Amino acid sequence: MLTVPPLIPRLLLALTPLATIAAAFFYFSQTNVLQPTPYIDEIFHIPQTQQYCKGHWNAWDSKITTPPGLYIIGYAWARMLTLTGLSESEACSTLSLRAVNLMAVVIYIPATLYIIQRRVWGSQAHFSAFSLVSFPLIWFYAALYYTDVWSTATVLMALAFALSPRVPFYMVQLSALMCAVSLFFRQTNILWAAVVAVIAIENSHYSNGAPPKNGALAQIFSTISYTFQIELPIFNILISYASVAVGFSFFLYINGGIALGDKDNHVAGNHIPQVFYCALFITTLGFPVWFTWAHLKAYISSSFSVLGLTVRPLFIFVLIPRLLKSYAIEHPFLLADNRHYVFYLWRRLLKPAIYSISVEDVMQSQDAIDPKTLDVISIGLKYALSAAIYFSLWNIWTTLTNSIPAAILVRGRGFNRRNGKSISPAIDLQCLTWPILLAMVFATLASLIPSPLIEPRYYILPYLFWRIYMTPTTAGKRVNTDARFLREWIWYMLINAATVYMFLYKPFEWAHEPGVLQRFMW
């Protein structure tokens, strides 16, 4: 790989905040020129917020499945805009409400990510934060009035408070409060609230004098032992986050389930392949950070180990294909809307590979291609997909387990997982531990498997938690990450440029709705 002088990536990275913000404003302005009316989910969110702006607090669209957090923020934003002299209709217009998400993407989320990355990455936090805020599934919705931006922002703020040094009482309270607020945007955030609670426990555990522990079992048992101690710090943490869980349980009881509306189309399933799709998503979008030739060499070398020669073929040729075929779900929403990229991904890749069906179903070329050739293509797709899934799962697990330091920091002093030097209390880093990793795995599985619809937005938080805690390594050594952050930012912005171009400048029409422009999006 081409070696770039260290100063060049650092200078270029210094320009990424300005470039990211400028691009977001350009995208926002173009969206409101070319698509001034509500689009797809906005046809539910914007009218609902406008009902609140009119004071109709009892009005509710039964098709809406998430709580009213976005609409409350939109209402508050509109009230503030009226103080500047705007009329109520102008302050609560589509343009004004979309600005709520733009504000989050260019101000709120970067600031929150900086705080988080300062605790996890140290001095490289500002580079990491602005690289990460350009993540396509966040950045794309800067110009649309969707719930995902503020749902993500509130979970990140809860994490930022939980990572505070020594986890003081008021920071725990603020973190738990933000966990509760996050539930007003997406109900499954309760699972990530549990992850934040574990992070707060680990932060309190090791910053209050626990001896460093090596190994998974030692760390897990040490954390469990600390959790059951009757001491004020852990009692404060448990009560704070348990209150959020109790409140959410009450909501489930009153509501009769997790979906707020349209319950017939939002029934929980057993969608194990959703985890596989998420793994592919994380590995693909995160490749500038994890990719090195040494990392790939380690994967290839492991193929010749005992486990590699036994377990890997079992997964690739038997287990993964069987799970895909037995538990894949073709949701009606997936088939009904050709405005989403996943519609084409399912029809042209996933479905032929999973069910080993001939691709002429998509290509409509049965007469042009020999049936035996089609069978070969189908089988090849099947095992190529299975191999890609296995590598993605291995990659995510390996990058995270390699990011767990050899020793946990104690009272601000210990091994710096970046350069091996001692750490001062001022920059005490909150590293990944085995309890945190297992909590992340649990939250990912519990949030994805019940979801029958393939939806990339469900992968935002699994991706962000992986990216926040994943430490790039080369042959087991920590590396300077400036060049990787720069490559990551370029990769994200290339994806953003492509998706924005398709969204804004490549519209199409449905035959049954002539004259109405449809647009491609995530």
Curated annotation (Swiss-Prot):
Sorted UniProt keywords: Endoplasmic reticulum, Glycosyltransferase, Membrane, Transferase, Transmembrane, Transmembrane helix
Main location: endoplasmic reticulum
Record field: transmembrane: 8-28, 96-116, 125-145, 152-172, 181-201, 234-254, 275-295, 300-320, 388-410, 434-454, 488-508
Protein biosynthesis among keywords: no
One of the Pfam families matching this protein, by short name: DIE2_ALG10
Keyword Cell inner membrane: no
Alphabetical GO biological process terms: dolichol-linked oligosaccharide biosynthetic process; protein N-linked glycosylation
GO MF, any single term: dolichyl pyrophosphate Glc2Man9GlcNAc2 alpha-1,2-glucosyltransferase activity
Annotated pathway: Protein modification; protein glycosylation
Cell location: Endoplasmic reticulum membrane
Superkingdom classification of source: Eukaryota
Protein family per UniProt: Belongs to the ALG10 glucosyltransferase family.
Protein's name in the database: Dol-P-Glc:Glc(2)Man(9)GlcNAc(2)-PP-Dol alpha-1,2-glucosyltransferase
